[in-house]
Amino acid sequence: MVLYKNKKKQIINYANSNWGQNEGVEFQETMLQCILEAVIVSKDAKQVLSLLHELKLFENFLWQRVNTEMSLNHINLTCMLLLYKSKYEYITWDLIDENRFQLFFEKVIEVSLSLNLSEVVYMIQFITLCFQFSNIEKLRKLVYQLTNISILNSLDNLDKVKYLLHDSSSLTKAFDSYKEKRPSIVEKFPLHNLLSRWIHSLLIKSISYAQTEKQEAKVTPLLAIINMSLVLLSAFPTRRFAHPVIEDSCFYTALRMSLYYDSNELFKKMTDDLNYVLKFPFDNTRGNEYEKEQKIRNDELVYYHLQLTLFSDFQKELGDLVFCTQTSLQQRQKLEEITSFLSFNSLKSLCSKCYLRTSFPEKYAIKVDFEFLKNVFINTYDRTRLVNDYDEIINFTLKDVLGERSVMDQENSLTNYFLLQNTAIQYLSISFFMRQQSKAYKKLLLRSLYAELLNFSEQYRRLSIKNATKNLTKDNFFSLNNFKVTSVAPPQIGQVLPQFVKCQMGLSRPGPFHSALRDLKNSIKSPFLCLIYISKDMEYKLLHGNALDPLEGVTDFTIATICNDDVGMFQSDMQSDSDNKSINVYLSPFYYHSLAGLGEYRPKQLKFNFALVLSPEANKYWLDLNILVSLLNRAKEFPKWFEDLFLGFGTPDICAFPNAGLNSIYARNLFNTVEQLQSVLPNCHVPSNLSTESLLIKFYTNQNKISADVTASDRHFLLPSNRLYTYNDKQLESILRGSQPGLTMVNGPTRCGKHVLVCKLLEVLQDTSPNDRTVVLSDSNFSMNTLFTLLEKARCFHQGHLLYLSDEGKDETLERYGTLSSWISKLPGLLREIGRLAASIQAPGSHDASPDTALYFRDAYIKRLWEKYLNTVDDKDSVDAYNRFPFHSYFGDKSKRPIETYNKDNFFDYATKLYGELEYMFQQLEEIRPFGLLRYYEDQELYALCQQSRIIGCTWTSLSTRLGTLKEKGFCFNNLIVMNSQNISESSITSILLSNCEPTGFDRLVLLGNQYLTSGNQDINNTSNGSLFKRLRYLKSRIIDLNTQYNVRESISSLCSSIYPLDIKTVDSSPNKRLDYGNSGFAHEVQFINVGAFKGSQETEPVSGYKQNLGEAEYAVALFQYMRMLGYPTNEIVICTLYESQVSLLNEIISVRCSHNSFFGQPAFVGTVEKLPSDKRVNFVIFTTVESKEASDHWNPKTFYKAFSACSYGLYVLCNRDLFRSTRGLEKLWNEIEKTPDKLLLTTGEIYPSSHKIGSSVETFEIENLLHLSNYVVEMTKKRLNTN
């Protein structure tokens, strides 16, 4: 820490001297050397790089001096800062000068060839970064020429190139074409020779480096080489040529690393990743997975190669063993026999000749020994283990958990390397992506399990000392009396694992355990348990604290699933006084199989003596992991157009309108005028005097232009379309494109009408394809509630075809439109109408008793009366049609407009509409009827999901718990609409798409998001599993940008536009024109307020990263109280901040000052900006920034944009205004900040909602400080009390 403080002071002095720009070259070089040493020596490189980023070393010095004479220190520091900025998205590639970047790129290539590997680590990482961002044009041109020339030239030097390429005609053609054109390329391109040696030279250097360097501090260069190789093996288009060049040398480098360093799990992870990429069965030119038959043929070739190698090179040592069959070579016993006859050198030679690709043991020997090579050889060719690799993903042992702990510990020693890495944005195949995400979730789960086991061990020790009893009880774990296996289902054909293992475990004093399971049942459908065994000889150590490791007492564990019936039993029998109760669980088949082995032994009694209820976080990881694994075998069921886009092949426009297909659509009340129609569809043919109420639009292409024939629609729709909203041109374009097959991406800020857009798109899809099923996905219930409120207002959707899967539970959603409970609750009202209808025609009997009797009444009476009416009415335009209508009595009482007021001469058309209402009522009864036959709510929901519903709205959380069951029951859909897609991970969307059982696949994918909002999804932030919206945007997919915000003040919109260059116009669509008036009691709608010191101090930081600002917290609560005194509703006010520690302080103050006072209440949200729901609509935001001395990483454009864009009418920022001048990305805010005073300015005589008109003169007064504001609020409260 002292070292960092000294270096920090020195770096700040350099910055104050303008980075020595007025000094000589020698001073500048010394300065760069000092700064570079500070980064390398520091234990937290991120902290130093963050300081350099804040001081603008890159912008003010390094980048300005990029030239051909740059020093090594200059190059390394530039690479470091580019890596840092890209990691934390502080860089805008479009703003970097292309010529200067090309000069720097070529200089890095040149220098990295001439220096040792240890000196060019950051240069290699910089080039790797360029590979990963090859979607950016200026990077793509440089990357393509480097990879194509370097890899193709390396292929020319390989003896085995013909053998490697003979199965791929496209690779052979590309290689031959390069050989022909190389002389002309060399002549025209001077850098050809430099680029052609680059990759091959680095790989050779890595092999040489691995053989000579033996210090752990030198491991980073090898890791950099392997990471670069992994990116080259996965990034399109480099992957089509990379394998033949990279695989041997790269794998050898990893092998040498693993042999030199003992027990390092990071090396095992790295070699396993590399092994997986190299061994994965796919066609390099396309990324398509091999068919099962082709995999079998390839497997046969592997054993043929082994058999040939043994016969040709090892006949002398093995004798008659070389004549064994390929089948016998796949047996472990035969492999053991072969290795026993080989010497160490012979076995080493055999492993080398066979190009082995396998995982390594967890502990690596210091030197290569015979047992190590023997294990490598046998594990490669042993085929007695028939467990599929995707099943092995969910196999957990205690060794895995402890191994992950080792990785966590050792990652800290390699912080510099891991902080500066990005993730590749392209994948080899769909299943490769699924496996990669499975590994990421497994990593998160293992870390969560480790934390829970650690917590359990500590609680166990404390309770044991306190209670001194065997029946230990805690809310999250419970002791077991016994644990026995009750039934084992035999394996399926071709498998070795049991289908399931059902066990019974006896609980001691099950009260708290029931409570924990009940809470867990409310959050997920299938609660999971961690079964633990603590041996007797370890209890003493744990009780007396003699264990060296807190987990030393836990000697075995596995994960089990509680049977659903038992969970229901828990909830109904929680108050039981029984001392013992047994419950059933499903044990992990992997664990049981490992106990039983390959023999006949099948244990009946197991040793587990504790059951640990997993936390909701661990349950979520386990559930998501199981979903990913269960969908691996469906990885080929994507439509071809989306598979190509997902993997990064071809032009993204191929997947969009009109290339993905053209459909005719029905559009009702979509366009306001014919002129708007012609502006959105400039090449359309519109007949004269066309009404836009109901249109049929037929699209076609004419000379590469999209044209359309627009005619009035004469189609009869069951429900009318109401014109509730008007749509701007961008919204109309989104609706028209979204109704066509393929991908549609819509980007826009908050309050730009995305919910209204989706509502209208659903109506168009319903009218155009009534039988299509659409899933609408979002990241929050708030977003879904908003959408279904709009659907209810539209009144053009049949409620029986809507389904809202809410996370709020059955009881809470009884009255919510679209939920199953709400739909079923309509039954009594419909039956009452049936009773009234039967009475109006004097039909005897209780026809309103049930849906069955009502449907019988329809067939026996209503249909016959209508058929009789049709047959007896001769002239449909006469009064006779009115006189003979059989339902006068019913509609005379029911209709808002008396039936007698209609024109009797033209009554038949109206009679048809009235009968249509009766048919619709019976249709609803017919669709509700099946739910009465299903006993359980879960079965009713499953029926609605898989059979009846046409529009399904849900969050990923609510759908993920049902996904496994839905896949088995044939859940299918045609369209997927994802709202707030920047917050939903790729694996979530992929899982939903793969669970689709529609034979033709899905037709449309519509992604709506806001590219400037940071994701609140921690799974996206913690893993490489980013959002699909963001990745497709990187791949240059076409995006429609919405540019109109509704009911947002122009001053707030200007703040957002000053952070990001948004061309946004604001529209006031409120009925009372609220934007014309200010906020009651405030002189300004937006104000940045200098709070200043409170009690002599500003923010405090007792622990690093734990910052609090008492003055700002008190000011924020006082401002909230002031607004409440004026009558502002609590649900319109939000208090947000940058630090979780400040949230605790705010909650504490609110609890004391507001919670128990009916005058105040609590704000709608108190929390960090990161946790603020991106779609939460609030009118007023109080934002406390905490820091007043210097800005930290929290002061970044995305965080402030999210806070500003969350409000509509009022924004009050508590801050130190001067910090905005010096914070990168926020400097442009200063022009907006200066427009308002630095002290809070209030008005008098205004009570919410009445207010002054903006621009008019109003009496104001200034709040001097926090004490002044607090006293003013106290006086207002006293007056209010006296008034009451």
Swiss-Prot record:
Q: Which GO terms describe its molecular function?
A: mRNA binding
What are the alphabetically sorted keywords of the record? mRNA processing, mRNA splicing, Nucleus
Report the locations given in the UniProt record.
Nucleus
Signal peptide positions on this chain: none
Q: Which InterPro entries match?
A: Aquarius_N (IPR032174), CWF11_fam (IPR026300), DNA2/NAM7-like (IPR045055), DNA2/NAM7-like_C (IPR041679), P-loop_NTPase (IPR027417), SF1_C_Upf1 (IPR047187)
Its GO biological process annotations read:
mRNA cis splicing, via spliceosome
**The keyword Ion transport is assigned to this record:** no
Q: Would I find Zinc among this entry's keywords?
A: no
One Gene Ontology CC term in the entry: catalytic step 2 spliceosome
* CDD domains with a match to the protein in the record: EEXXQc_AQR, SF1_C_Upf1
General function of this protein: Involved in mRNA splicing where it associates with cdc5 and the other cwf proteins as part of the spliceosome.
Q: Which family does it belong to?
A: Belongs to the CWF11 family.
Q: How does it assemble?
A: Belongs to the 40S cdc5-associated complex (or cwf complex), a spliceosome sub-complex reminiscent of a late-stage spliceosome composed of the U2, U5 and U6 snRNAs and at least brr2, cdc5, cwf2/prp3, cwf3/syf1, cwf4/syf3, cwf5/ecm2, spp42/cwf6, cwf7/spf27, cwf8, cwf9, cwf10, cwf11, cwf12, prp45/cwf13, cwf14, cwf15, cwf16, cwf17, cwf18, cwf19, cwf20, cwf21, cwf22, cwf23, cwf24, cwf25, cwf26, cyp7/cwf27, cwf28, cwf29/ist3, lea1, msl1, prp5/cwf1, prp10, prp12/sap130, prp17, prp22, sap61, sap62, sap114, sap145, slu7, smb1, smd1, smd3, smf1, smg1 and syf2.
Can you name this protein?
Answer: Pre-mRNA-splicing factor cwf11
